[in-house]
């Protein structure tokens, strides 16, 4: 108050270099750096690149079969864990892989990887399921159409391609995500650590769920007669798999 009466000005505050907006001063000291991985236990196979996949199965005659959409429905029971590699492409939904998808993955990954330090392998079989199709302008009837091409059914939770060697996840994550975005179903790049984290997070959500109105409880108790619009798959998978789609947020 006396400064206002006397007309004195307030002292000018000078900002120091230690303010939040300024860069901290350089200080000498010991730095703690992460150890460099040695990859001593990694062995590169004789043929590290992805092998060529046949367009059609090498059998005398393939039997034509119905659609069998259960081939892409629900969770996968095969190729859900790592075998030799440390990084892979994880399918987040069901779908069919055509021969063109195999060629896209093979050419993209083989062009990127260094065969002296990296290797890749398939976790899905070659196309074996026959897809029939009739020509344009044909009338209805006349039996099932001729075989047009072959596909490989994939369920949610299956590994498509594994990559390993003397490399880290940051080096291959970009190319694996690039391949995953071109697949006919949702997919993403994962490592051993991230795959374990996804599984643990799902178990923790189920264990610490605070909402009593879960899909399993509503379907089991047949609340509001919901069982008349549900299928046996909904009771088995607790509503987490809807056809070829996977809904991980549902507990």
Curated annotation (Swiss-Prot):
Cellular component annotations (GO), alphabetically ordered: mitochondrial inner membrane; mitochondrial large ribosomal subunit
UniProt entry keywords in alphabetical sequence: Mitochondrion, Ribonucleoprotein, Ribosomal protein, Transit peptide
Membrane-spanning segments: none
Keyword Thylakoid appears in the UniProt entry: no
MF terms in GO: rRNA binding; structural constituent of ribosome
Entry annotated with the keyword Methyltransferase: no
Subcellular locations according to the entry: Mitochondrion
Transit peptide: 1-29
Biological processes, Gene Ontology terms: mitochondrial translation
Family: Belongs to the universal ribosomal protein uL16 family.
Subunit comment: Component of the mitochondrial ribosome large subunit (39S) which comprises a 16S rRNA and about 50 distinct proteins.
Protein name: Large ribosomal subunit protein uL16m
Provenance organism: Bos taurus (Bovine)
Gene coding for it: MRPL16
């Amino acid at each position: 108050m006396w400064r206002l009466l006397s007309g004195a000005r307030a002292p000018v505050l000078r900002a120091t270099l230690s303010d939040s907006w300024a860069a901290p001063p350089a200080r000498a000291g010991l730095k703690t750096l992460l150890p460099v991985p040695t990859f001593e236990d990694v062995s590169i196979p004789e043929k590290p690149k992805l092998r060529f996949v046949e367009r059609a199965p090498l059998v005398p005659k393939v039997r034509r079969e119905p659609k069998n959409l259960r081939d892409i429905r629900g969770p996968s029971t095969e190729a859900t864990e790592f075998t030799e590699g440390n990084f892979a492409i994880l399918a987040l939904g069901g779908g069919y892989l055509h021969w063109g998808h195999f060629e896209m993955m093979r050419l993209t990954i083989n062009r990127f990887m260094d065969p002296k330090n990296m290797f890749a392998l398939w976790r899905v079989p070659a196309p074996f399921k026959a897809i029939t199709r009739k020509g344009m302008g044909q009338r209805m009837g006349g039996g099932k159409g001729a075989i047009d091409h072959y596909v490989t059914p994939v369920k949610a939770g299956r590994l498509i391609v594994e990559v390993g060697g003397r490399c880290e996840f940051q080096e291959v994550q970009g190319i694996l995500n690039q391949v995953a975005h071109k697949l006919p179903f949702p997919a993403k790049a994962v490592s051993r650590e991230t795959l374990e984290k996804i599984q643990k997070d799902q178990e923790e959500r189920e264990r610490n769920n605070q909402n009593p109105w879960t899909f399993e409880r509503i379907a089991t108790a047949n609340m509001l007669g919901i069982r008349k619009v549900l299928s046996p798959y909904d009771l088995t998978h607790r509503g987490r798999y809807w056809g070829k789609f996977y809904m991980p947020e549902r507990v």
